Amino acid sequence: MDPKYIRNFSIIAHIDHGKSTLADGLLSATGSLSDREKKDQFLDNMELERERGITIKAQTVCLDFKSKDGNMYQINLIDTPGHVDFSYEVSRSLAACEGAILVVDAAQGVEAQTLANVYLAMENNLEIIPVLNKIDLPSADPEGVAKQIEDTVGLDCTGIIHASAKEKIGITDILEAIVEKVPPPKADRSLTPRALIFDSWFDAYQGVVVLVRMVDGVIKKGDKIKFMATDRDYEVLRMGKYKPFPLMQDVLEAGEVGFIVCGIKDIRDVQVGDTVTSAKHPATQPLAGFQRIKPMVFAGIFPVVASEYENLKDALDKLCLNDSSLTFEVEKSAALGFGYRCGFLGLLHMEIVQERLEREFNLDLITTAPTVVYRITKTDGTEMMLENPSGMPVETQIAKFEEPYVKVTLHTPTDYIGGILKLCEDKRGIQQKMEYVTDKKVIIEYKLPMNEMVMDFYDRLKSISKGYASLEYEFVGFEESDLVKLDILINGEAIDALSLIVHRSKAQNRGRLLAEKMKELIPRQMYQVAIQAAIGAKIIARETLGAIRKDVTAKCYGGDISRKRKLLEKQKEGKKRMKAIGHVEVPQEAFLAILKVED
């Protein structure tokens, strides 16, 4: 097809502003789905995506649309995730487009994550078409929200499209606006082939399926292609487009979006954001924008049953294919045995990975509390990055201890300002600015230690603001801090998986609360169990879990006291011996309790 009749666009929207419903509306308006095939959130094909109502993986669909100018257009929708943890996925999807539809809920207005993605789209020089969705709601305020978009985003909203994806209002207007406003791709089919990978996943039958946006040249079935970042060559076995079901083709030309299957078995050969080129005459320069993603949050994942260790490795390998941002390495814990230290983009990402491992691979897992990466300068001048508290050097060897800071942008209704400011102050935050967008909505900017964010910041923000506040964060750098390692000892033995790094000012309080929490969660034993919180050799809190006692004197009716004493002494001896060799089982809830302890 002539590139001038191709349009590539994506939809930017906050969670719950109706992006997936709008995508469903576009599919049915262009006749891509018959009534029999329709189901809600058609593009969210992961069970978890439907259940949580969020888009996790990027998807693509090619729509044929006959415009009012009489021409047939090929419109490629590249669906993007909206959550802050997946911003790299969003940036790759946006790099594959020339335009974006900004969907804003006419009742709720602009949210923090929408803004972050709009700025990404602007950096990629995309044509942005604003759309007010859910216009049929009684609480919709189209004029107010249109003004808010003009003020916060700086887009001209004079001819803003009013739509309701659910009631099928304004869908054709959106399609016409895409044809009219989004520029056709700049495509030269005579050049050396180059294509941008914006997603990939593992299929049990075909191997790796790679989603690409052709930028230059042509790739045909049977061609030898090269992945530039990993320097691997493969032959194209199958290729085509999603309409929305796979439609096989023999060629993909510049400007088009489609999939390529090469029978790739090794997950690590395909990096999202990489460039595909011809193996015979490779391009000299890859496409801009590829970056290896650095995980920001780390946690240990261990199988409950040790024999599941190999299955966990296979499962992580398979997930890594769909999720290039997940990293993992072997970790050995004295308390939990062998497992993996996994790196994630953020907390939602961590939850989703854990849930997918349990759901799709039927694994029973224990996850330790998440930690962030710290930077330590030792007394001998060497630098180290610390991902796991158990690897922390002795305090006398540390010259400088730095922790990562993030810039957090919060959008909230004015009613909840007080609670949110208190939460940020509790979390050692430094206020940067506060700006009223309207008389009912305010933007607050804080600089926060990332360590405080990974604990329970998001949950508490949502409960303080009854779910109305939204947040967006970006990493700003490392700063020196007074941090210590807090150990939890059970019967004098440090449980490595329960160690965490905290600010010295909070250590005493956090240690006491944790010891109390452990006392509630650890089941009582036949002997007394001491639960202690310690910094180095100094014990800062202690709780004692009482023993379960069997009444050994029950069978003595009356009689001599020395008989009873003998039985009690014998019981005491037994308990002492038991305590010496006994092993206390720590339940999964205890590992998660670290997250839920509020200072």
Swiss-Prot record:
Q: Where does GTP bind?
A: D16, H17, G18, K19, S20, T21, N133, K134, I135, D136
Role of this protein: Required for accurate and efficient protein synthesis under certain stress conditions. May act as a fidelity factor of the translation reaction, by catalyzing a one-codon backward translocation of tRNAs on improperly translocated ribosomes. Back-translocation proceeds from a post-translocation (POST) complex to a pre-translocation (PRE) complex, thus giving elongation factor G a second chance to translocate the tRNAs correctly. Binds to ribosomes in a GTP-dependent manner.
Q: Does the keyword GTP-binding apply?
A: yes
Give the protein name, as stated in the record: Elongation factor 4
GO annotations of cellular component type: plasma membrane
Fetch the PROSITE patterns from UniProt: G_TR_1 (PS00301), G_TR_2 (PS51722)
Report the subcellular localization.
Cell inner membrane
Any single GO molecular-function term of the entry would be: GTP binding
Domain tr-type G, by residue range, is 4-186
Q: Which reaction does it catalyse?
A: GTP + H2O = GDP + phosphate + H(+)
How does the record say this protein sits in the membrane?
Answer: Peripheral membrane protein
GO BP annotations listed: positive regulation of translation
The family this protein is said to belong to: Belongs to the TRAFAC class translation factor GTPase superfamily. Classic translation factor GTPase family. LepA subfamily.
The gene it comes from is lepA
Which keywords does UniProt give here?
Answer: Cell inner membrane, Cell membrane, GTP-binding, Hydrolase, Membrane, Nucleotide-binding, Protein biosynthesis
What the entry lists under SUPFAM superfamilies is as follows:
EF-G C-terminal domain-like, P-loop containing nucleoside triphosphate hydrolases
